Amino acid sequence: DPNPSQSIDEWTCGAFDCIAEAIDTEEMEVFHYHKSIIDTNYKLWHDTNSEFYHDFMHYHNRVTGFNDAYFARKNIPFDNGHVNVSSFTVQYEEYEGFEDRGELSFPNLPPNQWYMVDLFPGFNFNLRGSAYRSDSVTPLGPNKVLIEFRGYGLKKDTPEERATRIEHHNSI
């Protein structure tokens, strides 16, 4: 639409407020991009990735995150179909070979916090302390979707910080 009736902030209706200070403070850059065409329908992909039962499919999530705070999370709905999930502290050190990731958290983000924002109709943003990822899904047909995954780091990252951020991103 060349003449949108809403700004981005109006359209997102506050769904990004939970991570705004972490992602707006420093300039970011993409360090990872992957796309894939999946033989599934859009609704199935969206629902599978936005429901809480999704976490049960990931061994890593079951080991590092299933604590009282995890189960107290809430899906917080916003106008225009957007949702964010309240945060909890991920216990990375509970996963064999992992360690605490709090030292490299995004700006203004408490150590090892995890947030997820779903923007309807097809965008997902995950901020896991040191690693920020966005996924977009585009329907290509009734049973085919294009998924694009991006990983972000802070532009000011040192080479060592960037390597750690990439390792954290790739491990989830």
Enumerate the predicted regions with their spans.
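C-terminal catalytic domain of Rieske-type non-heme iron oxygenases
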Residues: D1-I172
